[in-house]
Amino acid sequence: MRSRIAAFAAFTIFVASAALAAPVTYDIDTKHAHVGFEADHFGGLSKWRGIVSGVNGKIVLDTEAKAGTVELTIDPATVNTGRTDLDDHLKKDPEFFDVAKFPTATYKGTLANFKDGAPTEVQGNLTMHGVTRPVTLKILSFKCRAHPMMQDKNVCGADAQASINREDFGMTWGKKFGFDMGVDLAIQVEATTPKK
């Protein structure tokens, strides 16, 4: 009898451990996610800054295995620089987002280089303007906790940065005027587990 009880206890612990170690899927909170950008204007005279607020997707995190994935869908029509005329130009010009032809951008990557239980990079591919290129995100901050306002959920938040060359994606407007094609990105996301 004791051996059966011990075996059952061991099985219970194994199942519980497996459950704790299982990958957890977090849905992007669209109200707390955006991609910020900073781009050159006239070869270093000034900077264009803005955000793209239409970001959704999911993060799958397995802290035990130190692994996970990120999938983001980005709506370039939500670009906001604080200037309506510039926003319209960015949305419509064939050498910028051209949202009529390319209504979404996507980023798919793998969480990597975990330190103290948290990833420090995402190694993935960005598809934008019909072109796919490898882009690595450097994670500056990544934290998870019980949601402070929704007791049946957990929440993770992350800040990351990357640099791209927009010419790599066929977005070359301004090059003939001396614009640098480099763009710095600042990504902020929060993601929550689905309601239980």
Predicted regions and their residues:
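Positively charged n-region of N-terminal signal peptides that target proteins for export
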Residues: M1-I5
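Bacterial N-terminal signal peptides
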Residues: A7-S17
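Low-complexity, acidic/polar, glycine-enriched regions of mature
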Residues: A21-K196
